[in-house]
């Protein structure tokens, strides 16, 4: 019964999709002299069957795997770069308040820029290629993650850190046993947010500034008015986004919820 309830939204979505497709039929223009050549009908919204058939064709030809792997690669490169630099800069900035006061407005301004601004700049500076999606993802991921990590470090017990300096505890040990455990909650929250936004930003950047990838395929599908293909690639983006949300982001958020974790342990 529970499994059926989970399938109900999907069934309703497919039925509404099919209904919208039936209502979107338009009559095309006549060809030639119009004699004996009736105008052909076309759909603005393809049926689920047409979309699935086009998706199967993309998978069988290898086009789906090729472009999807490129999108994932670019997104992961930008994600890793953004998280790494956020961690490297966030820790010292959280410990040094004057440095944080100087950098915080700059990072906040960077965070305020929408992805389309970075895409425009990078298309001029770097041209179409892998650089644009990677750096756009970095620009979207770095600011919130940096501020999150710096906030976590600033919230550490500074008296304990002062004791480590007095007793000359090695910095590597302080980092491993005090700093990293203390900011783990903030780091996991940053990773959860970054994973959620990376996929969307990567596809958007590819739409404008990449020679390949899922976003680039969407661009050409809409240019060619190939609606089944456009919907098929859209379904790919949604499927990967849902998989990331359910398989990675939600478990990370649940790991950050002490009440839920406590409840599970009590029941066990």
PLM regions: where:
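C-terminal transmembrane helix and the adjacent membrane-cytosol boundary/short C-terminal tail
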Residues: 154, 231-268
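Hydrophobic alpha-helical elements at and bordering transmembrane segments
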Residues: 64-68, 72, 76, 102-110, ...
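Transmembrane-helix boundary motif in ABC transporter permease subunits
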Residues: 77-107
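Periplasmic/extracellular loop-to-transmembrane helix junction in inner-membrane transport proteins
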Residues: 26-80
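Transmembrane alpha-helices
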Residues: 135-139, 171-205, 231-232, 236-237
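Generic hydrophobic transmembrane alpha-helix motif, especially the helices
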Residues: 108-144, 151-152
């Amino acid at each position: 019964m529970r499994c059926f309830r989970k399938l109900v939204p999907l069934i309703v979505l497919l039925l509404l999709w099919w209904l919208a497709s039936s209502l979107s039929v338009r009559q095309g223009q006549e060809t030639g002299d119009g004699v004996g050549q009736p105008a052909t009908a076309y759909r603005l919204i393809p049926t689920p069957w047409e979309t699935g058939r086009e998706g199967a064709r993309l998978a069988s030809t290898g086009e789906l795997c090729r472009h999807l792997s490129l999108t994932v690669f670019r997104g992961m490169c930008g994600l890793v770069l953004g998280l790494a630099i956020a961690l490297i800069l966030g820790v010292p900035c959280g410990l040094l308040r004057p440095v944080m006061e100087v950098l915080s407005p700059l990072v906040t301004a960077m965070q305020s820029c929408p992805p389309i601004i970075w895409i425009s700049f990078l298309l001029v500076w770097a041209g179409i290629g892998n650089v644009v999606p990677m750096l756009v993802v970095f620009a979207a991921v770095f600011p919130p993650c940096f501020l999150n990590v710096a906030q976590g470090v600033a919230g550490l017990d500074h008296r304990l850190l002062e004791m480590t300096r007095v007793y000359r505890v090695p910095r590597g040990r302080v980092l491993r046993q005090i700093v990293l455990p203390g900011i783990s909650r903030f780091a996991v929250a940053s990773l959860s947010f970054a994973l959620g936004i990376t996929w969307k930003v990567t596809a958007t950047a590819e739409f404008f500034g990449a020679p390949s990838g899922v976003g680039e395929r969407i661009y050409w599908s809409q240019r060619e008015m190939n609606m089944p293909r456009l919907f098929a690639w859209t379904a790919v983006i949604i499927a990967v986004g849902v998989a990331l949300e359910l398989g990675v982001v939600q478990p990370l958020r649940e790991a950050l919820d002490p009440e839920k974790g406590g409840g599970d342990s009590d029941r066990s």
